[in-house]
Every structure is written in C-alpha cells, then in structure tokens.
Amino acid sequence: MSQYKITKNKKTFTYGFDRVVPEYFMSVETEGEDVEELVGCFAPESGTSGHLLKAINKNGIVDLIPEEHLANIMLDLPF
C-alpha cells in the first residue's frame, strides 16, 4: 500500500493505492475532527482513478500532488 499526506487550510488529505483491494483511496481530516472517506472502500465514491482525480480537483489540491503521482493516477497505475 502506498499512502501520502498533504495539508492545506487546516485539512489533512491522505491518498494512495491499496494493492490488496486493489483500488485508490482518499480521505480528509479537519483539525481534530473525524476522518471523512472521500474515495475508496468505505466512501461514497469507489476507488477508481477517475474518482480520485475528481476528489483531488474538487478539493483544490492538484498543485500539491507530485506530477509523478498524477501521471500514474491518470494512467491508472499503482504508485
């Protein structure tokens, strides 16, 4: 499993790829509050690369994610 964290405006976004399932995931935590699953097994959106890209864009963090990760997501490759 790969797992990365990005912080923006008091929110911590965790994203990555779970090789066991296999699918992408993303969640967000706001300073001390519960974690909200955005993409993945326990989220409203399944763990497809399209859903992960949609969540990244919706939350305005595309500029914080390494280009290598974005390229792999767009090509639907694990990273």
Language-model features, listed with the residues they occupy:
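Amphipathic, interaction-prone secondary-structure segments
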Residues: 2-28
